[in-house]
């Protein structure tokens, strides 16, 4: 093979069954509408189980009672997860009140789950409530289109309330990119909103009739914050500002964290720098990256289909040149940018427009009324009186944005009375887990239900070694698909089996290095024993300001991952 093309541009071979399903779906319609009327089962059937994902839903069941129901010869208790499309995480208080009501009245679990992709999910929607949820979202100007499956998913944007002008500009671009890359099929409107079938033929000028080979994730990032974890994403626009005003973006392509246990052809990968582009080329470049991946991505193997694998197969320079050709531009050299952190600043922060922003820590993003901590009711009360908006962060927290000085005390009173401002340790603020059991069908080990007590134990270790005012970026994900973004943490736990995890070390605080597996298939006591020893060493031996992940690399405890496509599994 020549240097120019390390591998073929298009992978030949038998297409996956998902490709057949998309082709035969009549632009994502399938027989979803007919399935909705089938009262004999609580779930969708056949291809529709996968097709509903394009409409923002996953079919799930309660795994806590799966075996019990099987013994009783009952089908699993099917219910849908629905994920809203919410570019940049901004939601109005009117929209919040509508979703609060729906969650309370029409879902099994009664909760709103904030996700690390800056949106919210409902868990436990019975089939009879599926159409009503889409109609409720539509009535307040929201939808769930393209938040799952082989499309451009929810577009993230740094939650930067301090520089309001820059955030407003970046947020507008996140919305524009999201709209530009949406599917054009009318299937969503016909099925869920009862809109008339139009005589014209469906066309998908950007995504194509069989859509993308695999999921595709996009971010807009405002340095020095990397709160959206750009290296977990396929396409990233890093905001470059002059005098506080947005002038263009650095483009980074080909990040992604999902792996498969034991499959060395899979790897987490940091995104590659392509170059700088002025603002006016943003949509053309976004489209060019997506269509290049559409045409070159591997449709014969879904485990090798993401943009990161395409880049490694054809070479970064070849992919970049094709994007330039399709967009009709030449990238300029990357402009300087630097990341200093990725956590949220919990509490009140004053923006440059003299408004205040209150960032509330929501453990694991789960909003529910707990005994003595009515979080859900408290947020509803704030939504009723707050004139600004709410912003969901990529750390699963919530910002009450744009609070005038005169309203501060009123909002703080509700937040405190509801347990929304309870003091937590820096360690808890910088820890995160995906949903996992009982609803996720892919879960191998607990994550969300495991994290709170696990962090209690970590807090005890931090106190024992005199570093309780410090933090380690710590994440738990229930399976190697990696929704909890453990593969960008300083300490990442990846679920292997019930009660067992792979322990990864050596990421860094700012999320620019992939961690390496340190110990495999170990239990919580074994994890804590390892971390006890390592935290003690870090506390005693670290250099000034040295994070835990950087220390583990410098001290030779773990080798850094330099080229994950080739050395992640070594």
UniProtKB/Swiss-Prot annotation:
UniProt key word Iron-sulfur: yes
Assigned EC number: 1.8.1.2
Positions contributing to siroheme binding: 483
Keyword presence, NAD: no
GO BP term, example: hydrogen sulfide biosynthetic process
Amino acids binding [4Fe-4S] cluster: 434, 440, 479, 483
UniProtKB keywords: 4Fe-4S, Amino-acid biosynthesis, Cysteine biosynthesis, Heme, Iron, Iron-sulfur, Metal-binding, NADP, Oxidoreductase
Record function comment: Component of the sulfite reductase complex that catalyzes the 6-electron reduction of sulfite to sulfide. This is one of several activities required for the biosynthesis of L-cysteine from sulfate.
Protein family per UniProt: Belongs to the nitrite and sulfite reductase 4Fe-4S domain family.
Protein name: Sulfite reductase [NADPH] hemoprotein beta-component
Annotated organism of origin: Shigella dysenteriae serotype 1 (strain Sd197)
Gene: cysI
